[in-house]
Amino acid sequence: MALFANAPRLALYNPLIKSIALVGLGLMNPAQAADEATDEEARLEKVTVISTGIRGAQRTVTESPAPIDIVTSDQLLKTGRADLTEAIAKLLPSFNYGTNVAGYNSTIRPLSNRSLAPAYTLVLVNGKRRHNSALPANGSTDSSGANSVDIDMIPISAVERIEVLKDSAAAQYGSDAIAGVINVILKSGAEGGHLGVTYGKLYSGEGEVTKFEGDTGFELGDGGFLHLSADARKRGDASWNEKATNNAYFPGDPREASWDRVGVKNGDPQIKAFNLAYNAELPLDDQTTLYSYGTYGQRDAIINNYFRYPNGNANIPELFADGYYPLNNLDDTDYQYLIGGKGQALGWNWDLSTTYGRNNNHQYSDRTINPSLGPASPTSFDDLATYRFEQWVNNIDITRAFDGLFGVPLQVSAGLEHRWERFQTFSGDAQAYQVGGYRFPATLPNGQANPLAGQLASIAAQAAAVISPQDTTSLQRNNYAAYVDFGITPIEPLFVDLALRAEHFDDDSGNTVSAKLNSRYEFTDTFAVRGTVGTGFRAPSLTQIGYSISDNRVGAAPDGTIVPAVTRIAPVNSALAQALGATSLDPEKSRNLGFGVTWQPAPRTSLTADAYWIEIADRIARTESLYGPALAPILAAQGVDTSTWTSYYANAFDTRTRGLDIVIDHSSQYGAWGDVRWSAGFNYNKTVIIDVKDAPAALQGLGSNPGGSLTWVGRAREGDLTDAQPKTKWVLGGKWTLGDLGVNLQTTRYGKVKTLQQLESGDRSFGAKWITDLEVSYTLYDNITLSVGGTNIFDVRPDKNAIPSAVGLNLYGNSPFYPGGGFWYSKIAYDF
């Protein structure tokens, strides 16, 4: 009853309730043409054959022993957004799209699954492991340091569908699949194609987007194909911040009255990007086929930051008399290529492949200074840092069906995998990290007395995570894995699948064995139950092991206040981190249970409900920032400035996540009024911390630490795991088709989120919100479609931060939906 307690008030004040009512009525409406439905119509998605979730023979979605969601190309394109990450989050209730609004992390948005960070969901392309990004996660809700996959480097135009396995699958696919698997299936075929142009912008006038997309197929040899896809997009920047409350100029300066009080421009960066993809197959004979795919992406970003005030020690008035907004510039290059062969021999189906992927992120700045160099500082830097991640994967898989072995149908699959990966960082220009020792003079350039006289200027290029030679790293490792998978039908209604996987890492991650048992029992043609029990693991990312950086931007004080600070992430094996109690990282281990039902209660109606339980031991998190006078002797002994805020990665928590996924689909036929496909999705999840590791001995007994913090992992890090993601999410939609006219309506409710700080007084809560999207399309001449639409059409914003910073930063906190407000767009597409 509590769920509907405020319904009258919502009906009066929130126009979104109209959208919800429309969807709800459609879901309750009986199918008017039910008596005319064929058997095929009565089983939605029965013909959708999938390749994710079970080794061996392919199965349909409704026959899968594990929960699978299918996202089609048409659904992705109708979200109205240019990036694959946000499109997925809009369509699936168990996924949430985070927004990092500062620094280089604002170009890669975290896609959480079942409240677990992106690193716990494995990404495949055509069933093969996708390489990771080079950038460690260090953003708003995910500061784990893991480098997850950047799926925005895959063009949406290349996607035929996405198969989402909502189940732990480490025993089948290896490390990282604790929360599930995203399998991107690329378009194939020698015929057909699509061209599209989209233009749109935010209601505020910012964030202007222009996008071109296209794909087409060609014949290749005798019976083969080559399918090409490309996207190109340009997005303007956008920001959402409060006006600053502090002063920009020294007392008595008349310029203070005319300052616009824009203390920060954090938000969406300006982006120019293009992505290319191909997918090809070439039969050699009746038994053997060669196949290959590749993707290439290039993304250039210009990222704004908070204002360097004229009266601050991060500004040199001879260079910027009125202060400046530093820029982060990113040049991101990403590619992956695969070649393989598949066929039949001696009664076995075999598949042999090799794939190589690389992500290279080069950072520079068109506008910043190193204040410690004084007026001699450059005002731009061509090289601040470079991050690179490489991955080479080799697979051989075999599978065979036995009809009479042991008297029951049996599917046997097995395989071997070798994976090599390397993470590297490269230092930038020496002047960017040089300590120049500049002190402010007694007078300002205008001849007036300088209130900063004698003070040291800030060190290093501003708004930049500069890598110096001492911070560079080069780590690599090999992983060897073997798996077996048995699928058996002991009696006709029951299917059981057992998978075992053994892995060896040649670094400290060591050896591990994972197991998974799936089963499905079909009581009738329309009702079945399924269950899962298994174990999994995730090896520490190379970025979590070896990433090292010094950053001179800001830090979060115990009460959540954003303050200027020099922060440093120390690698766990460094002398500095170990002096502060760090130890080598252990792999994260998981246990999981799942139980679900699939039901088709009426023609053209389907329902799935899946409950899950995931327990993860030794979760890796970044410690809180450690700083203050009590640490001065330790820092000084390591040659580190005693004012530095230091953190590192550690196995800090054991957690338990429990939840429920419900998906309902229904198709209504209204005769002359057309057809409507209704959908409803719901996710509930709750993560609790069941154990917090003790602080290391090195941090205990240090004595008084006035003005500092010795909290190893506290409420802030705990909150990232337990409260930063909404515990509930509803996705309700209806797609109406009447001849050439189409209307697609979707409304999503994001539950409340909370940001915790070390001091409870700094906690912030952000209420639940409904976000509604609408697209109207009309097809001309059978192949040209015009569309207009909007996302967040009612311009709903997150609740404002109750404790904003003096510079106006972090207006909306860590919203689970895009905080920039309403966005409208128009699109023209040509299909052939």
Model-derived segments and spans:
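N-terminal periplasmic "start-of-domain" segments of outer-membrane beta-barrel proteins
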Residues: 48-79, 134-142
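C-terminal beta-signal and adjacent terminal beta-strands/loops
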Residues: 616, 686, 746-756, 777-832
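Short acidic/polar hinge/loop motifs at secondary-structure boundaries
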Residues: 128-166, 214
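Extracytoplasmic beta-strand/coil segments of soluble accessory domains associated
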Residues: 57-60, 88-133
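Transmembrane beta-barrel wall of Gram-negative outer-membrane proteins
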Residues: 191-194, 204-318, 322, 326-345, ...
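Gram-negative outer-membrane beta-barrel transporters
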Residues: 36, 414, 600, 606, ...
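N-terminal periplasmic accessory domains that precede
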Residues: 84-87, 91, 111-112, 124, ...
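Outer-membrane beta-barrel transmembrane domain signature of Gram-negative proteins
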Residues: 324-337, 356, 368-494, 694-731
